[in-house]
Amino acid sequence: MPHDIPADAPAAPRHGDEVVTSRELVMALHRSAIGRLVMLSADGGEGGLGGVELGRAIARAGMSCILIDLTGEERIAAETGIAPGSPGLHEFAENLAPLGEIIHRDSRGACHVVLATGAAPQPDSPDVTLVLAACAEAYDCTIVALDARRMDSLPSLLDEETAIVVAGQAATPDGYATVAGELRSLGVDDLIFMQCAATRRAGRRAPDQPD
């Protein structure tokens, strides 16, 4: 799977090696032809919000960015302050809302967000394919947040301008190894690992930390 991140870009190869921060990853993106990042969570916790953190970092760096949430959960909507009941991919697929109405703005940043309202759609569905194609034309970078339990759907999201990022906390290195092992068993060996900056506990957000 070709990923055009430069050879000198920060990368986190094997278990036990250093993990990049969102800032380092943004620097690498500036020097590459990568236009899409598929985000997988290494721990099911903070890693599930890795796409939000990275999207904010990309937007702060002056690049246009959109986050497509295919996790089927509510974490990303809650973190970005998008109102419950806002239209998403389901409404778009059912012709209940045009593309422009399912694109929301992160309440704490300039990154745009598309939600998978209701059940998470299949990444290879015609509607997701159409949205991804439109976003590739309109944004510098598209982030696709995907449930790590749906790795079998990865091939439909990958091309020569796509990279896979495994996000999580430094305190849970085994999570990186587990997800990486599963990906490599599928023949995916070119991975980037990202350490999330903040820790959230008991539903309360910790103060922002520089990434």
Show where each model-derived region lies.
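Short, charged low-complexity intrinsically disordered segments located at boundaries
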Residues: 53-55, 120-123, 164
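Acidic-aromatic/histidine active-site loop/patch
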Residues: 1-35, 87, 94, 170-173, ...
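Post-Walker A helix-loop "phosphate-sensing" segment adjacent to the P-loop in P-loop NTPases
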Residues: 56-68
